[in-house]
Amino acid sequence: MLLKNCRIVGTTDIIEGDILINGEKIVGIGSKFSDTDEIDIKKNYVIPGLVDIHVHMRDFKNKRKEDFYSGSRAAIAGGVTTFIDMPNSNPPVTDIKTYNNRLRLASQKSIADFGLNFGVTKDNQKSEIEVEPMAYKIYMDNTLGEIDEKTIEETIRLRHSVAIHAEEPRLFIGNKRPASAEVTAVKKIAALANKYKKKVHICHVSSQNSLNFFNKYISSEVTPHHLLLTEKLLKEFRGFAKTHPPLRRAKDTKALWHGLKNGDIQVISSDHAPHEIKDKEGNLDESLGGMSNLDVMLK
């Protein structure tokens, strides 16, 4: 296949040319190729496929919201060719059997490349040795059940790749999740990463003060909604603007943009988490957190 008249986006510049494809591989970029199967791109941009490292596909018991097939179609439509699925499904991916079942299901349904994370609990630290997830995911907010500090520390000490939802639940005020809950958790994780000289990834950072505790062992991501939206939207859109962690102040979004530009934050990820309308309307405290944005993140 030959893609003609492309504007090809590279790491440092944009060039015009044609792209020759053989099977699933690009075998040439230039202007002197020929092929019986041609597509005229008409000077539109061609970019590498995005890798979204934070996605919540709803397959298993919540597949009415989305399954691996519909979710991966949304990914491809949005320019995402690889996604990493989070383990807080129903049932959660916290044991070998469920991990293998989800791997099989995604392999059958997904039209995009994918990887799976494995959920850490205080009871499964020995059982997951046989799997090779993209990362071991810790939910400090007790999404997968209450987790103790010993489990968190041992996971960071022993595992090759650890991703963390950093919010300290003891600082929650009812259903509200203040920025201090995230900052306290990030400070704790950064200290453990430095103690064991181990890389740790902080998911969906939302507060400007969290950035103050990053060190050379911390990588992090930010979502489009935390870059572009603020807590003022909660008054008008209520549950439809509810996320975990919550939308913050305008000065937080400004700090996150600065962190992205200076390299403190290395990744933009969608934190795609679709729900049915009934899950988002009504009382803000009772509505479910999450936004469906896998197919629009690049836009």
Residue positions per predicted region:
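N-terminal metal-binding scaffold of metallo-dependent hydrolase/deaminase domains
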Residues: 1-33
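Gly/Ser/Thr-rich active-site loops/lids in small-molecule metabolic enzymes
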Residues: 286-299
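Metal-associated gating/positioning segment near the N- to mid-region
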Residues: 44-109
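Active-site metal-binding motif and surrounding structural segment of the metallo-beta-lactamase
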Residues: 32-47
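Conserved, mostly hydrophobic/aromatic
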Residues: 54, 75, 79, 114, ...
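Short, acidic/polar
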Residues: 65-72, 122-131
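Divalent metal-binding segments
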Residues: 56-65, 81-96, 118-124, 139-146, ...
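Histidine/acidic residue-rich metal-binding segments in metalloenzymes
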Residues: 125-139, 143-268
